[in-house]
From Swiss-Prot:
It comes from Mesostigma viride. This is NAD(P)H-quinone oxidoreductase chain 4, chloroplastic. It is found in: Plastid, Chloroplast thylakoid membrane. GO terms for molecular function: NADH dehydrogenase (ubiquinone) activity; ubiquinone binding. Belongs to the complex I subunit 4 family. Pfam families: Proton_antipo_M (PF00361). It catalyses: a plastoquinone + NADH + (n+1) H(+)(in) = a plastoquinol + NAD(+) + n H(+)(out); a plastoquinone + NADPH + (n+1) H(+)(in) = a plastoquinol + NADP(+) + n H(+)(out). Its main location: plastid. PANTHER family: NAD(P)H-QUINONE OXIDOREDUCTASE CHAIN 4, CHLOROPLASTIC, NADH-UBIQUINONE OXIDOREDUCTASE CHAIN 4.
Amino acid sequence: MNNFPWITSIVMLPILAGLLIPFIPDENGKNVRWYALGIGLLDFLLISYIFGYKYNIQDTSLQLIDDYEWISSINFHWRLGIDGLSIPLILLTGFITTLAMLGAWPIQKNAKLFYFLMLAMYSGQLGVFASQDLLLFFLMWELELIPIYILLIIWGGKKRLYAATKFILYTALGSIFILIAAFGMAFYGENMSFDMQILGEKEYPINLEILFYICFLIAYAVKLPAFPVHTWLPDTHGEAHYSTCMLLAGILLKMGGYALIRINMNMLPNAHIYFAPYLAIIGVINIIYAALTSFAQRNIKRKIAYSSISHMGFVLIGISSFTDIGLSGAMLQMVSHGLIGASLFFLAGTTYDRTRTLILEDMGGIAKYMPKIFAMFTTCSLASLALPGMSGFVAELMVFLGFANSNAYSIEFRGIITFLEAIGIIVTPIYLLSMLRQVFYGSENLKLLKVNNLIDASAREIFIISCLLVPVIGIGIYPRILTQIYDLKTNAIIEHLEIIRSNSQIM
């Protein structure tokens, strides 16, 4: 345990600082914007300091542990810590949240409430990635749901009530299964505990372990999202403000993938061996179905939302591959998509600010009026379709090769999955390039040009996209800069699974 609670500090700073927002004198939201941005940046700098000076990249064990007893009767602890699985996503959370606050600069309606909710989400998402107590993990998982619901209700589009209700129903109902499984695992055996390390060391009857696995899988599949519990995402993205979309695409979806690795894969390995082939099948369905469905979307944000569902399918396939390179690719895909997805939704929002429409047919021919936005949108779309030299290409290639070379499956099964993956990789450029054509090329909408002032990107907007694209290109050129952070941890998980699989009769 640490002398100074480093991880508690980064988790609690945003929400505690947010509680001071009502006392800030402000009329037009200017002071609140700068205050929230300063807190977000301060927390991100603190995260960066911890990673640079306090975290040992060569140590696969849990580090910088904060452990305080909370409710002794059920052995519930405030237990936080970081390792190779959590630190990349904690860095991603700090980075994207800070940029999302800068992206929300034009918001003036209820600015104090808006930025408080952003800071509360910040704490909740950091808490999910840092929690090492399963009940605390559940509380943090729930903490970020309420801010998103309110952000949708107040700052959403015309169908915001429907989208917010659907979001809360899907995610809250899914979360119930986390609570059921958490108490089931904690109460099993002689020593009651929610400590993830202790729970992972328990030996459960295989039928009970499978039951726990299914409960967790339902909740995480909703958050990822995975087919068929994905339908909340396009509706939510379609109605949410684009700064909220940046957090949804950049961080929220990654919570599902992270939890599958941290809990299902790491703590319930026998059940994971049984379910892995089904995860691969669901992953392929995600890739193909969402890519094809994206073609039919007329709303630009819904189209990008379906592309997110498609890209998260690669995470499922990487998790199910039983290979070092496959799991490493899944982690890389989560970080890569977080950056690219946030950039695409931000650009969709800036385009809406100028055209006042999200319908693709109502746009067209605006490239010459907004050349900077056009250039940035094109670059981000190329990154999303996994252009070589971008992070998405490396991530998808690693997942593809990892599953193709897995010795856990028959050659026929591997062949079918990799073939369908390849189809998805081919289809993705078609709908993304089609989106670019509809928005920026073709005949001009004279009514659109007459009503709206199509000014080009501001310095603030260029700065945000540049910040998101620099790591995308950097990781694409030299992926080791990211993979070295978590490779030892993911390799240890795969080695543990291989030992269990070699002694198991499940597969």
